[in-house]
A protein has these predicted regions:
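Short solvent-exposed loop/turn micro-motifs enriched in small/polar/acidic residues
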Residues: 11-14, 234-235, 243-245
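A conserved active-site cap/scaffold subdomain adjacent to cofactor or substrate pockets
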Residues: 271, 279-288
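N- or domain-start disorder-to-order transition segments that initiate the globular core
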Residues: 7-38
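Charge-rich, well-structured scaffold segments of protease-associated domains
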Residues: 3-5, 21, 32, 76-231, ...
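Short hydrophobic-aromatic micro-motifs
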Residues: 27-30, 252, 261-263
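M16/MPP (pitrilysin/insulinase) zinc-metallopeptidase core fold and M16-derived inactive scaffolds
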Residues: 40-104, 285-304, 315
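Acidic, glycine-rich loop-and-beta core segments that form the ion-binding/anion-interacting portion
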Residues: 244, 256-258, 263-265, 272
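Active-site-flanking beta-strand signature of metal-NTP-handling nucleotidyl enzymes
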Residues: 40-43, 260-264, 423-425
Length: 443
């Protein structure tokens, strides 16, 4: 008997992913999975907080909320009830470069779900009373987020490396900025970017491709979708500038008991799926797993931190890698010293074959487990599209990860670990001058 690799056993026979650009400029991407009884669909619009002007801060997030507040033929309750009655899930989110309306439903109810979603992105009323009610809700959401140490710190970390740039602005805006948004501004944004703007529809699961195609073809004419998300924005009139990286040591006072540390480094955006997954494997070696260098040194051996991890954030024209840790004030010097020491060791001595094997298996395992989630598959379709990558099945991705060599990952790490470009943000309660000098001596 031939022993097949695990990923071949799981994914042999996957139906091909299809991408179609329709006459109305809608992009339709589908990954049929006949073995499931659910369907996931996302409507993706290439507009986010990054694309807002100074007098429009928070408008995309505000419009996202208003999609649920009623159309010409459905009340907000009707929209909610339509999904509750079928046991489905409908939600939306705004990011810095996109807005997404997405659902997961039993496959036999997909037609009803799409009918409601199309209505929401075509005929929302944005009534004055709903705007004022939701304005208060969003302002409450913003105030609540300011009580979350990690959320406020993440915004501060973005501001540290891209000061004054829209990529660093809070996605929801401030309480004052949301308070200034008029119905006319909201309606203009909705009409320009949601009703008539570029649209990518990503669907995965037990989907009827012919039916989805008919739904997409019946949508009104849209803006042109280019090969990647930056190109889409540019081709539809956005004239924003790219972010300029700001390195160095910064301290920010915050009313929280623990100190938080963000060591950030810039990277070029991945130009291929191979680049993307190479970064993922490198990140797993450094800090993304419990067996990673930083987790072992800062938590398991040092006992300094409960929260230790690293992550990469990809935008259309830049990438940021970040190592994060939180600790008691008394352990601050040890945390910073350990961060720099371990990263320098990785740069000078590299990693072991066992570390690389473990990291590759970890990233493969994540993909295999995540692929059980149809919503994840639909979002992965969009990720590949927005970054300009060819679509790939789980099997193809796992094969790609296993093809990465020690040289591939080492080159990625060496390129990343340029400490002349490092930005360290120390975020916490009353960083005194004496405290700052002690940290400065370590970097």
């Amino acid at each position: 008997m031939t022993n097949l690799p695990l990923w071949e056993v799981f994914f042999r026979g996957t139906v091909a992913i299809t991408t179609q650009i329709l006459s109305n400029n809608v992009v339709l991407i589908m990954e049929p999975v006949a073995t499931v009884k659910t369907a996931a669909v996302g409507f993706w619009f290439p507009v986010g907080s990054r694309h807002e002007g100074a007098d429009q801060r928070g408008v995309t997030h505000f419009v996202e909320h208003l999609l649920f507040k009623g159309t010409a033929t459905r009340s907000a309750f009707d929209i909610a009830l339509a999904f509750d009655r079928i046991g489905g899930y409908l939600n939306a989110f705004t990011d810095r470069e996109s807005l997404c309306l997405h659902c997961v439903v039993p496959a036999n109810h997909l037609a009803k779900a799409l009918e409601v979603m199309v209505d929401m992105v075509s005929n929302s009323l944005l009534e004055h009373k709903e705007i004022e009610r939701e304005r208060a809700v969003i302002q409450s959401e913003i105030v609540s987020s300011q009580d979350d140490p990690e959320e406020t710190a993440l915004d501060a970390a973005s501001e540290a490396v891209w000061p004054g740039h829209p990529l660093a602005a809070p996605i929801a805006g401030s309480v004052e900025e949301v308070g200034r948004l008029s119905r006319q501004v909201l309606m203009d944004w909705y009409q320009s970017h949601i009703v008539r703007g570029p649209l990518v529809i990503c669907a995965a699961g037990n989907v009827d491709g012919d039916f989805l195609l008919k739904v997409a073809e019946n949508l009104p004419q849209r803006g042109v979708c280019a090969k990647n998300w930056l190109g889409v924005a540019r081709s539809n009139g956005w004239q924003g500038t790219g972010p300029v990286w700001n390195s160095g040591l910064q301290f920010k006072d915050a009313p929280f008991r623990q100190m938080q540390f963000f060591l950030q480094l810039p990277a070029c955006p991945p130009v291929s799926a191979r680049d993307y997954y190479c970064w993922a494997v490198a990140n797993a070696v450094v800090g993304d797993t419990m067996s990673s260098r930083l987790f072992q040194k800062l938590r398991e051996e040092g006992g300094y931190s409960y929260n230790v991890y690293s992550f990469m954030t990809h935008y259309s024209d830049t990438t940021c890698w970040c190592a994060y840790a939180s600790a008691a004030r008394k352990d601050s010097r040890k945390v910073v010293a350990t961060l720099y020491r371990e990263l320098n060791l990785l740069k000078e001595e590299g990693f072991t074959p066992d570390e690389l094997e473990a990291a590759c298996q970890h990233v493969c395992g994540e993909e295999i487990i995540a692929a059980e989630d149809i919503d994840y598959r639909a979002k992965r379709l969009f990720r590949h599209h927005s970054l300009g990558f060819p679509q790939a099945t789980t099997e193809e991705i796992v094969d790609l990860i296993h093809s990465l060599t020690t040289e591939d990952v080492a080159a990625a790490l060496n390129k990343l670990l340029d400490f002349d470009k490092a930005s360290l943000l120390v975020y916490g309660n009353r960083p005194t001058e004496s405290f700052q000098k002690k940290i400065l001596a370590l970097v």
